[in-house]
Design a protein with these regions (language model features):
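Phosphate/NTP-binding elements of NTP-utilizing enzymes
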Residues: 1-167
Length: 167
């Protein structure tokens, strides 16, 4: 490639790689609340344990979905894992919200992913870059084992009901 050719992907990463708020606003066309912006900034800074305490219907699943999509689009290789204590909590709320936001991506990004019932994979490298949904319970602490990558994002919904043995 010559120096005069523009690489849109590199430009995209330069703009959004460290700025998930701009990604949400400009790529997904959404307007995050202030607490959601702070949550996204904390993830971008690499904070390891972020707790969001909020009531029902305030946008936690939405903010987590945005973070997972931003992470998947701007990091490679990467693995995202979403977990909750029960399948209904995981699939009826968080993973359903994640899928709805994947569908709102611009076609050039949306078409890069394959959506399954329990996984979203980067088509070009499905083993290296994906988001998987896994229930976690005290009886199955191994559910989160084996997730290795340069970039891992773990989202735990209803974390207060997930036993410490799982981690």
């Amino acid at each position: 490639m010559t120096a005069s050719k523009k690489n849109n992907f590199i430009d995209f990463i330069e703009v959004y790689g460290d700025n998930p708020v701009a990604f949400v606003e400009e790529v997904l066309g959404a307007t995050p609340l202030e607490w959601q912006k702070q949550f996204l900034r904390d993830i971008a800074r690499g904070e390891r344990r972020i707790s969001v305490r909020a009531g029902h219907g305030v946008g936690k699943s939405t903010a987590c979905s945005w973070a997972l999509i931003w992470h998947m689009v701007t990091r490679y290789p990467q693995k995202g894992v979403v977990t909750a204590p029960t399948a209904p909590q995981l699939f009826d709320a968080l993973f359903a919200e994640l899928k709805s936001w994947i569908n709102k991506l611009p076609p050039v990004l949306k078409d890069s992913f394959e959506v399954f019932s329990d996984k979203i994979a980067f088509k070009a490298a499905p083993e290296s870059s994906f988001i998987s949904a896994r229930t976690s319970s005290k009886e199955r602490p191994e559910a989160l084992a084996g997730v290795h990558s340069e970039n891992v994002l773990l989202i735990v919904d209803e974390a207060s009901a997930v036993y410490e043995e799982v981690f």
